[in-house]
Amino acid sequence: MICETVEEFAAALPPFSALAGLDLGDKTIGVAVSDRMRGVATPLETIRRKKFGLDASALLAIVEQREIAGIVLGLPRNMDGSEGPRCQSTRAFARNLSRLTEVAITFWDERLSTVAAEKALLEADTTRKRRSEVIDHVAAAYILQGALDRLRNL
């Protein structure tokens, strides 16, 4: 089920259940997960994209294994807030994924999440090679943490 607002998403979630955050890219999907109290987002892994069926199988395996109740998908809006082709692609991915699972799905504005993740990794003195390996799932954690903070204040 796709929830257009965070309020609708919150109403669809069972209490004390973990969430997943996704940073959807052309080549990779960054994945982060929350604790059951929905306080902290933790980077989990980066999935190399192949085709939708394989990507969805990998994501749904994580959802099942970690008992995820909701998915927060980063929505790559333009800096002026408008939606371009990447937003349309992300919404299409969500529609296709929602056909395969009953898990609630919502969107979170991901503008500058990768920039914030890159900055944090630079401050942690991470090597360039290591940054390229973890940037997507660290960005997913930034996306998920933003949504968790909003959910906490509803």
Swiss-Prot record:
One of its GO terms (molecular function) is nuclease activity. Gene3D superfamilies: YqgF/RNase H-like domain (3.30.420.140). It is found in: Cytoplasm. SUPFAM superfamilies: Ribonuclease H-like. Its EC number is 3.1.-.-. It comes from the Bacteria. SMART domains: YqgFc. Keywords: Cytoplasm, Hydrolase, Nuclease, Ribosome biogenesis. GO terms for biological process: rRNA 5'-end processing. GO terms for cellular component: cytosol. NCBIfam families: RNAse_H_YqgF (TIGR00250). HAMAP family: Nuclease_YqgF. Belongs to the YqgF nuclease family. Could be a nuclease involved in processing of the 5'-end of pre-16S rRNA. This is Putative pre-16S rRNA nuclease. It comes from Ruegeria pomeroyi (strain ATCC 700808 / DSM 15171 / DSS-3) (Silicibacter pomeroyi).
